[in-house]
Amino acid sequence: MSIRIGIVDDHPVVVGGLAAALDAIDGFEVVDRAGSIREAEGLLARDGLGVVLMDVRLPDGNGLELLARTEGSRRVAVIVISSFETTQYVAAAVRFGAQGFVLKTAPLDEVVEAVRRVATGGSAFSAGQLREGLRGPIRLRPRERDVLRRVLAGQSNDEIAAGLRTSRKTVEKNLSELFRRFGVASRLELGLRAEREAWLEIEPR
């Protein structure tokens, strides 16, 4: 019996290439595709699929947040696929009940092996990914999230202070604490790391 596969990704070239590659594997059949959270919700509730490969960043939301919402109701195993293997992404995938995590740049044989493992009830997380999952996602306090969002928006300390109705000195203290906590020396380093590691994409639960 074929492993029936669904793909959730909003990039037609990615979906087309992945679907063609998997369809060429003996025993694999790509039978459904979704390009948004709305479409993916229906796909995850559908009977007859064995494995869904799901991207994180979608036009109308975040695939990991969808996993959190559907954790107790999904009818299909999910492998998260992403261009980025950040601590936030991997930890959320583990925590919200995905069965694996694979980079989009992984060789096809790695994707095939992940699908086969998951389709037979196994896990497609590496040992390192599971360790990251057990450590959990980076947790920012509400004020840290507010300040960081405004840093990423390019606001000055004075603008952040005005927006948060606090003093410039308090904002500078907040930033100093973030610098110390994450081992960075500037707003630029802080912003680059936050973007790269997706600190703000997954809300704490």
Where are these regions (language model features)?
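Short amphipathic alpha-helix used as the core "switch/output" element in two-component signaling
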Residues: G42, L64-R75
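Recognition helix of helix-turn-helix DNA-binding domains
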Residues: G154-E189, R193
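Two-component signal transduction core modules
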Residues: R33, V52, V78-I79, F101-V102
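Acidic, metal-coordinating helix/loop segments flanking the phosphotransfer/catalytic sites
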Residues: R33-V51
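The feature encodes the CheY-like receiver
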Residues: V14, P59
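Short, flexible helix-to-coil linker/hinge segments that flank and couple to helix-turn-helix
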Residues: Q88-L148, W199-L200
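Active-site residues of response regulator receiver
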Residues: D55, S82
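Acidic catalytic/metal-coordinating carboxylates
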Residues: G35-S36, N62-E65
